[in-house]
């Protein structure tokens, strides 16, 4: 089974968790897109809270009613992808440059389910470069401070994310620095250190937020819990 098929079946399994009347957080990325498509096919009376403009556009095209995070007291269920799923369902997210809105939606949710293909499940976080969202003003200086923190944790200095069109800018108008790491031995300590840097909006370490994971594998969908 291809990685894309594994993403698809995990997204379809997650869509079965949604019940009529729910407020549902809609994740961002290729795996989350499969969930949004499967959810739309069920034609339930729900409201979606998108984590990016890209997801909002897809949901509208598919006929899913949307609402803003500030217009709901809480979110019943959020389903989102991840770049890596490590021990205890610790996650690296942010490959789609939507980590800030994703984390805001996750933290407002009663239940969070992460979906992914089997390759995303790792023994130790860090092979995927850690995204860090940074205020655009003075970001070069912020990047230098991040490099100092990286050195403290025996990690490589972060790099400003670029695309064919130039610097990648998030929906919130910020930029992304990606920290190549290889192995993040102390995720909680690194997360705390990154938050001490003025100019850092947030980072892609999602710790103690996921309630379960649905992995698409060649044998079907496998459920993981912390």
Curated annotation (Swiss-Prot):
GO cellular component: cytosol
Name of the protein in its database record: Ribose-5-phosphate isomerase A
Highest classification ranks of the organism: Bacteria, Pseudomonadati, Pseudomonadota, Alphaproteobacteria, Caulobacterales
Family indicated by similarity: Belongs to the ribose 5-phosphate isomerase family.
Organism in which the protein naturally occurs: Caulobacter sp. (strain K31)
Keywords: Isomerase
SUPFAM superfamilies with a match to the protein in the record: D-ribose-5-phosphate isomerase (RpiA), lid domain (SSF75445), NagB/RpiA/CoA transferase-like (SSF100950)
Catalysis: reaction(s): aldehydo-D-ribose 5-phosphate = D-ribulose 5-phosphate
Lineage top rank: taxon: Bacteria
UniProt function note: Catalyzes the reversible conversion of ribose-5-phosphate to ribulose 5-phosphate.
Gene that encodes the chain: rpiA
InterPro entries with a match to the protein in the record: NagB/RpiA_transferase-like, Ribose5P_isomerase_typA_subgr, Ribose5P_isomerase_type_A
PANTHER family: RIBOSE-5-PHOSPHATE ISOMERASE
GO annotation terms (biological process): D-ribose metabolic process; pentose-phosphate shunt, non-oxidative branch
